[in-house]
């Protein structure tokens, strides 16, 4: 085990919004600030550095919406000013447009969606994403990830709203995507780190939900993905994801079954400190099948007792290569 320093972090977020509705029109203005500060590192190791870090984001947004019987539309613009310690401040403008056209009484609704997000890459977020992350304290923290996305598709409700479907094609342009890599097991530095780069993602998505009776729901969904990366490292993402869900509701309890599938993934193995030049191969994360069960018992109007089961097929599941989950697990 590598004894590297631990990190403290605290955050502060403030949001405000003002809007007005007149007839079928709506105007909304939003402003916000989110800051994360860290430092006070403890311990001594080759990874340590004396500098603290901060991750501050200033945001603003404008929305105009118009809603009618067969047409819903919303337009706007999001602004982010990103300030990460050790990095030049960056400004991002993300357009926003959602258009929906009901051409068949809810049964056939074409739509177009254009939007985006900013995802923080502070210490807490990275450790929640990958528990085996070993930061290099001699480098600044990574930039925040910005995602510009567009989706074109159709949705609808059929058979007296018992059948709901959604089909769409999506395309995302991702700036500062985190390309994770793992260190070679032949070195004393085991764990994961990352480099950042651009990634383009195209996806074909389908979702179907069937409710034959009011207290039972069955749904199935899947998506195929293709990637255009601008890095020599493997992206560590699947080319197919699928989900099957079933849930039964009763006045006193509910039972849900979840079946998740994920295709093979590959993560690069590198020699420490040389993520682009020291690649020694790829680690394959095998096809994942995960069966889960969750039960809720409504003991009273205010008290619910729950139980959840995960990996009930008792397979070796890898969230990250070289670190598998073993056996089934239960949570009460």
Model-identified regions with their sequence ranges:
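Outer-membrane beta-barrel domain signature, especially the mid-to-C-terminal portions
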Residues: 124-143, 174-199, 225-243, 261-298, ...
